[in-house]
Amino acid sequence: MSSLFQPRPVLSSQRYSQSPDYVDTRRSIHNGRLPLRESTGNAQSHSFNGLVSCYQNQVALAPSMQTTIPAPMVPSQSLDCLYRVPTPRQQARFQRRPKTSVNPLYFWPAFRQYRNRQAHKDTQKDKGGVWRRPELEDAFVDSVLLMPHMGRRKFSMGGKLHGRNMLISEYIFVICIALLGSKEIFRIDNSNESIEQMGRKQVSSHMQVVKKFFEDLRCFHFLFPSEEKKEPGSTNSDDCYDEEEQESFKSNPVLTALAEGRVPDVKPNYEYFSQLLALQSSICTRPKTCEIFVSSSDIKIRDDVAYDVHDTPLDQASFPHLNKYTNCDDSPNVLGKDVLLHEYTRSLDRTTSACAKSVTRRWQHDAPAMYETLELPSRDEECLLLEMCATLELHEHAKFPSGSELTGFVEVAITQPALQNHRWKCITRLTRPAELHSDEGKHGVYTNDSGIHRRGCSDSKAECECHTRPRQDIHVPFPAVEWASILSMAVQYPDVEHQRLKEKRRKYADGDGKKELERAGSKRKRSEDEGDAASWTRREPTGSDLICKVAMYQELWSCAPDSTQWTRQAIIFWRFNTTNQWHKYNPVFKPAGTTWRWLTINDPMSRYHQQKALVYPTANVSRDALMSPTPTIHQHLTAAMNETFNSWDQGSSAPHVPHVPPLQTPNNSIGLFDSFSNGLATPPPTATLPPAYPTGNFDSRSGSFDARSASFDTRSGSFDGNLGPNNGVAFLPTTGPPPQHERQPTALGNNNQPFFDGQQSFSEVKPINTAVNSYMTASTSLELPNQLVYDNSGVDTSNMQGWDMSALDGWSAAASAPGSATAEWGPNTKVESHAGDHHGAMWAPPHWPLSAGAAPSSHERGASPRPLKRRRETMDVHVPVTAGW
C-alpha cells in the first residue's frame, strides 16, 4: 500500500526565481515526526489517509493552513501535538505540487516524452544535455509563454534591436546570472564567438527542436509566432495583423525588466495557457483527403495513346498527366476506371495554426459580400475553425474532350465517437470576382445546403439510412460545377511573366541559354531582371491573381438521431492559390498541393491575450495606503475617553459578545469617527469593547446613540446637561451602593455593565498632560475639556480623605458654573464602603497619581500661588459644589 502514496515525478518549475511568488511554501515542511514528550500514552495524529484520495487537489488550500485535523490532547501529550508535522505519507502529498504551479507545456505528451529522455542529460553537456542546469530549461519554457508576439516589430534594448528569440535568450541570461552569477555556462571551448552569440545560437537551435512537439496544437501560434513574413509583392502577404491592436512594448513588464537587467516580477498565467491547450479536446473533425482533378470515362487508352469518344488521339503535351498513374498503384481511389486528364491538387499537408483574422480581413477587402454572411463563434470552444489552402496547377487552355468531369473529393475524419452516428449536412458559400463570372447576371454569394451521405445515397432518397451505422469519415460536398466555370474563365487571363520565365527555363534546359546566364552576372543585368514595384502594380490581372480572390467557406452541421436540433460543429475556410506566385515582385513557382491549419477566434496579438498571459505579483501595499494614518498615542487616549459615546451595554445576557456600533446614527448626530476634526480616522482598538462608564440614550432597536441633547463647553469648563439622572455621561458615582459580586468588579452607575476580570480598565489609563493638538480639535458638540481621566471604578472610600474646599472660597475665577449645575448634580452623593471590594491601601494618599486626580502644578496653573490641596482626616460627603470648581 505504501507505493500508492509515492509522489508523481514532476519537473521543477520556477526554482530560479528570486520573487516570492515562485516559491512553493509547502516544500518548507520538514520530514520526520515529533516524538511524544511522555511515553505513557498512545496519542497519534489523525491522518485520514484512508478517506482522502492520495491525488487530491491541493490548489484550494493555502500553504500556511493545516490540512489535517489536530489530534486531541491527552495527559500524555504536550502542546506540541497541536502543531505536529505531517506523517511521511502526508509529506508525499504535500510535496506533490498541483498542475497549476507547473508550466502546462510539460504535460503535453510529446514534449513530456522528450523531457523524460533528456532529464538525465541536462547536467552533462558532452552527453547531449542542452543547458547543464534544469532551471534553465524551466526558464526557456516559461519564456515561450512570457514573451509577447512582436510581428514585424523589434524591441530596442542596449542600443540594439531585439527580436523575440533574442529576447528569450536575454531572459535566460538574466536567470543564469541570478542563479550562477555569470553566463559562463554558455561558453563553448575553442570558439571565438562571444557568450551572447553562443547563447543565442543555443536558444535558436533548441527552439527549432521544441517547436516540433507542438505543431498539432490549435494554440501553436500563441506559443511560437509564424516565421512567414509579409513581403511586398509576394503572394504570401495574406497573414496580416492590425498594428494598432498590439500593446506597446513600453508597458510590457517583461521587456521593461529585461531592459533593466533584472528578473521580471510577472510570471506566465498557467491557468490561462492550460485553457488554450485544452482546445485540443474539442476537435471533432480532421481533414483527411483533398483531391481536385478532371477525368473522363469515355477516354480509351490503346498502345499508350489516349483516344477520345470520337476516336481522336489526344496531344500528350496538352495533357501531361495522362500517364501519371499508369504504371503505379498510387492512383486516386475515387478515380476508379476513369482516365485522369488533369490533376489540380492532391497532396495534403498540415501546417501550424493561425488566427481567423488572417482570413476574414482579406475577405473584408476582397470579398465584402462574403464577409457579411460570416457568423463567427464568440468562443473557440463553441465551434472548430480550420483553413484549407489549395494551390492549384492551372491547365494551359482548359479545353477538355467531351464527357470530361471535374471532381472535388474532400474527406474529413470524425474524431469524436459520439458524433459518428449523427446526421450531417454542409452549407457552402462562395464568391468570385466579376472577371470569373461566365454570365452578366447578378454576381452574389453562391449558397448550397446539402446533406452528407454515403456513396450511393443522396438527398433525393426519401428514407436515408446513412446514420444507422457509425461513420468515421464523411465526404464534404465540393461545388464542382461552380469551380469548373471558374477554372475555365481563369485561363482567359494569361500570365505573361510566368510564361516568359518558363521559356527561359526551357532554353536553359536545352543549352541555348548559357550565354544569357553568363551575362546575368553583371550588376546591370541583375538590376534589369529584378522586379519593379511600379511595373508590378500596373500589370494586368492574371488568372492566378483572380483565383486568389475567390472566397469560400463550408459549415458542417450535425444532428443526433433522436433529435431535430442541428449543431454547427466546424467551419472550413478555403483559400486558393496557383503554382504561379510572386516573391518580391519576381515570378516564382510553387508545387501544387493543399495545406490545412487550425484557426482560432482568440488573437495572440490582441490586448486581451497579452493581458491574460501574465500574472502580476500581489502588491505589498502598506496599511497607510489603504486606510487612514495610524493614530498617535494622544489619539488613542482621546478615543479611550470618548469610549462612552461609541459603545453600549448589551446587558448581562451576553456579556462576552462585543457590539459594533453603526458608522452613523440615523439622525446624523454623531458617528464612530466623528471625534476628530480631519474627517474619517482609523477607529481605535477599543472601539468594540464595552465601556467602563454608564451609557446614555442608546436605542437598542436601532442600534444608535443620540448625543445631541448634551454639550460640553470647553471654554468655561462646564457641562450643560439636559439629561435625566441616568441618561447623561456620569463622571461622578451614582447614588446607591454597587452590587455585590464574587469575581468581577462592576463599573459604578450601571448594574449590568460588563467588565473584564484580570484586565486593566481603559478608564484607568493616565495620559500625559499635554495640550490637545489640531488633529484632536473638537468637531462635534461633545468634547472633554482636557485629557484627565476620571477613575470611576469601584472604590473603597473607607480610607479616602475629603478635599479641603475652604481654600477655594478666596480664589477668584472668571468661570462660573451654570444654573443647571446644582439641579443636575444634586443631591449630594453618599458613598458607602464595601470591604470586600478593594483593599484600602490601594487608595491611600501617597499612591494617588497626580496626573489623574491631583491639582495641576504651578507651572500648569499659570504660576498661581495657590498651594496644593490638603487632605482631611475624615471625608466629608456633604461638601457643596461651589461655582469655583
Swiss-Prot record:
Keyword tags: Activator, Conidiation, Nucleus, Sporulation, Transcription, Transcription regulation
Stimuli inducing this protein: Expression increases significantly during initiation of conidiation and remains elevated until colourisation is stabilized. Expression is positively regulated by BrlA.
Family matches, as Pfam families: TEA (PF01285)
Thylakoid as UniProt keyword: no
The UniProt record lists the keyword Nucleus: yes
GO cellular component, one term: nucleus
Compositional bias of kind Basic and acidic residues: 508-521, 831-840
GO MF annotations, alphabetized: DNA-binding transcription factor activity, RNA polymerase II-specific; RNA polymerase II cis-regulatory region sequence-specific DNA binding
Phenotype on disruption: Produces phialides on which short deformed hypha are formed.
InterPro entries named among the record's database cross-references: TEA/ATTS_dom (IPR000818), TEA/ATTS_sf (IPR038096), TEC1_TEAD_TF (IPR050937)
Biological process terms in GO annotation: conidium formation; sporulation resulting in formation of a cellular spore
DNA-binding region ranges: 124-217
Subcellular location(s) per record: Nucleus
Function: BrlA, abaA and wetA are pivotal regulators of conidiophore development and conidium maturation. They act individually and together to regulate their own expression and that of numerous other sporulation-specific genes. BrlA, abaA and wetA act together to positively regulate the expression of the Pks1 gene cluster that mediates the biosynthesis of an anthraquinone derivative pigment that contributes to conidial pigmentation that provides protection from UV radiation, heat and cold stress.
Family: Belongs to the TEC1 family.
Protein name in the entry: Conidiophore development regulator abaA
